Amino acid sequence: RVLFRSYMAVIDGQLVVPCGTQLPALFNLASGKLEKYTTGWGGRVGLPKGTWFVAGSGQLLSHSGDLYDMRRPNDEKFANSGNRRDFKSKLYPGFMTRIQVEPTNQKSIGDFRRPVLSNNTMFYTDNGIVAEDISEIKLTPRQADPRRDQDKYPDKWQASFPRRWKLETDLRVRIQAGNRVYCTAPGKVAAIDLPAADGQPRISWEATIDGDPLTLVAANGRLFVTTRQGRLYAFGASAAPEPVTHARAAHTGNNSSEQVKLITAATGISKGYCLVLGLDNGELAEALSQQFTVIAIDNDADRINRLRSRWHGLGIYGTHITALLGDPLTYNLPPFLANLVVTETARLFNAEAAAEPPANIYHALRPYGGTACLPVALKGRQVWKDSAAKLSNAQVRESGRWLLLSRTGALAQSADWSHAAGGSGNSGSSEDRYLRGPLGLLWYDGSIRWERQPGKTEVRVAGGRIFVRADRMLAIDVFTGRRLWDQPLPQAAGAGKVGEFVATADAIYVAAGRSCVVLDARTGKQRSQFQMPEKIGGSLVHLRLWKNYLVSYLGKTVICLDRQSGQLLWSFEASRPELSLAVGGQRVFISELLNTRRGETIEKSGVKTYALDIATGKQAWQGAGGAELRYSETHDLLLTATAIYKGLDGTVHRKSVIADPTKDKWNYKSSGYIAGDSLLIGGSDNFTMYQLTSGVQLTKKISWFRRGCTPLRTSPYMVTTRYQGQAAYIDLDTMQFQSLWNLRGACSNNIFPANGILNVPNLSGGCTCNYTPTSMALVPRTTLQAQPKK
C-alpha cells in the first residue's frame, strides 16, 4: 500500500519516506514497523497532500511546504462534522499536528517552499531568504487567513518562530554546507555566508550557468549542480582538471548480431520482452538487448556475476538486460511476459535433457504470438508437437535448426472491451469469461497519468493492447504494460472534440467530426479516413463495429459503412437525434430516447425501438423506445425500457412490469447491465442480480458507499466500481468486494475486465487526493504460476 518515492530522511528517531502523491510514511528505526498511516484522502482545500519532498530537524518535519510537530498528536476536528464520526486527525502524516501550512497548499499544490533545516535554524524562501530560530516554538490558535476563507477544514494551530534575519534577493535557498547556504535562480548559482549572532548574511560568490538549476550537492570541497536541461556543473575553490570520461565497453561482434537477424526473421518478432533460458558467453543475450528488453536466466553464479559486471560497464544492465540466477527450465516466471524465448545453451533442449516442453516456457509466452525459438533435437520434436496439441492456442512449426513454439490468438474465453460500453451490443459488459476471481497482481507502472474526467480520456482494450485516447492515441501491452506506440491525432479527433472510438485487433476507428479516421492498431499510423456523405448533416457519434459493418449516426440519421472501404451501405432516418444504438446478431437496434427534462413519457412521445437488418437496413420489427438499449448476442436478447425482446424477430421474451408481483418478483425500470448470463439491475452503487433468460432473482440487493462518481463496468464474473474511495471489483461468484487499496477509481471508471486481465490504466490526472498514481493489471491467481505436468 506504500509506494516509496525520492529521498528518505531520519527525523526524531523515525525513518520518514516520501511516497509521491501519497502522504509520507513513518517507520520505526529499530523494528521497521510502519507507524500510523492513512491515504486515499486529500483533495479538499487545505488538507495535506503528498509530494516527493521531506526534510526535518529535531522534532520538526517539513513536507509539501507544511511543517509538522512529530511529538504532538493531532487533535484536529472538522468544522462541519455534525453527528458523523470525526476522522480529521487521521488525515495527517503519522496523525501528528501540522503547525504551519504552505500558502500554495490549497486545492492543488503550487511551487511549495522546500526549507533547509539545521539544528536550530530554518532557512526558507519568501520574497527573499529568511532564517528563523526553530529552537523556540510559539504555538497559538490559528486565525482565519483571507486565502483560506472558503476552507471547510481549517487547522487549529499556527506556529511562529523568532526571526534571525532576512536577505532581500531573487535567489532561492537550496542546501546548507558548513557555514554557507547555497542558492539558485534561473541561470544563476550563489553562495551565502551565514552571519554570527545578530549579524547579517552576505553573498560570497555568484556564477552564471546555462539553464535552470535543479539539484545541488556539496561534497569533497565542491558544489555540484544539475540543470533541468541536463547539464552538470562543478564549483570549487580552485580550477579543476577536465573531468575524466570513461568509455563504455564495445558491444559484441557480428556473429551474434547475425544470429539475431535469423531469429527475428524466423519468428517475425523484433521487439518486446525476450527470455534467454541458459547462458554461455552472453553474446546472444547482449545482441538481443539492442532490440528487446532481455531477461537472462542461468544457474552458474560465476557466469551471472561476470556478465552483470560486463553489462554494467556497457550501461545496459537494469534498463536493457537483466541476469537472474536459477534453473532456466524451472524458474518461476510470470505469465504472458515473453514475446520471444531463446537460449545460448543448446544442450538444455536435446532429447535427453528436455523430453517435452518445460511448463514454464509456454506459461511465459505472451498471447497473440509470443514464440519460443529453441534448438530442440530432431528426434525430440514430435514429443513437443504432441505436447503442444494439448495446450490451448499452441502452435509448433520448424525452421531449420529451430523448433518454434507459439501461443497464438487470445486467451481462451477472453474478450475485448472494444466499445465505450463493452462491445457493439452496448451491454455495459465484456464477454470475458477467462477473468475470474480471486485475482493477483501481474504488473504495475506509474510513468503515465491521464485525465480522470469523462470525455477527457477514452480507453479500449482489444487484441492484447490497451488503447488510450487523450489529445494523442497511445497503445500499451495488456500483459506487460510496455508502451507500444504513441501517435498524434487529427485535431478534430482530440479529447473533448468528438465522441467515441472503437478498437479491434487490427484497426482503430475514431469519430472525427465529419469523418472517421482509421488507424493501424499495430503502429498507430493512419490507414485511411472515411468522409461522411454531404447530404447527411451533423457530426459522427457513437460508433458501433460488428464484423465488417461500421454503424453510427449523424443528427437523426443512422448510417452503416463497409469498415474496409468506408462505402455507405444504407442509412435510416429516426424521429429525433437522441438515440441509443446496439448492434449484433445480424441486427442494428435503434432506440429513440426520452427527454426526461421535458417530462416526456413513452406513451405520449411515441418514441420507438427499431430493429434493422444490418446488411440491407430494412426494418425487421419495431417496439416502444425510450431508454438505452442493451443487447446480448449470446442469448439474442434485447433489453429495452418496456420489455426484453428476442433480437431476431422482436418476440417479447419478458415484460418489464409484472401484473402480479406476488407471484413473480421480476420488475425493473432501467435497462441495467448484461453481465454474461446475468442481468444487473440498479445504479452505480447498488444492484440486484437476476438470471437473464428466466428472470430468477439470484442475489439480494447489494449496495455500497462509493465516495465518488465512478459508474459500473461488468463482465460475466466481475463488477468494477469504487468502494469507500478506492478502486475495487466485486467477485460475482462470492459477491465479495476486493479493494485495490490506495488506487483511485476514475470518475469515468478506469477498471476494464478484458483480454483475460483486469486492466487499470492510471486515470487520476487533475486529482489532488493522496492516492498512488499507478496503472496496474491483475489476473486470476491460478495463472500466476506454471502448472506442473501430471
PLM region spans:
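Repeat-blade elements of multi-bladed beta-propeller folds
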Residues: 4-24, 42-68, 80-96, 110-129, ...
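Conserved class I S-adenosyl-L-methionine
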Residues: 269-287, 293-295
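Conserved SAM-binding loop
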Residues: 307-308
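Conserved SAM-binding strand-loop segment of SAM-dependent methyltransferases
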Residues: 316-328
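Aromatic (tryptophan-biased) beta-strands that constitute blades/sheets of beta-rich domains
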Residues: 1-4, 33-45, 49, 69-114, ...
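A short SAM/SAH-binding and catalytic strip from SAM-dependent methyltransferases
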Residues: 338-354
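A short glycine-rich, Lys/Arg-flanked "PGG" loop and its adjoining helix->strand segment in the class I
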Residues: 351-370
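A short acidic, Gly/Pro-enriched loop at the edge of an enzyme's catalytic core
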Residues: 329-340
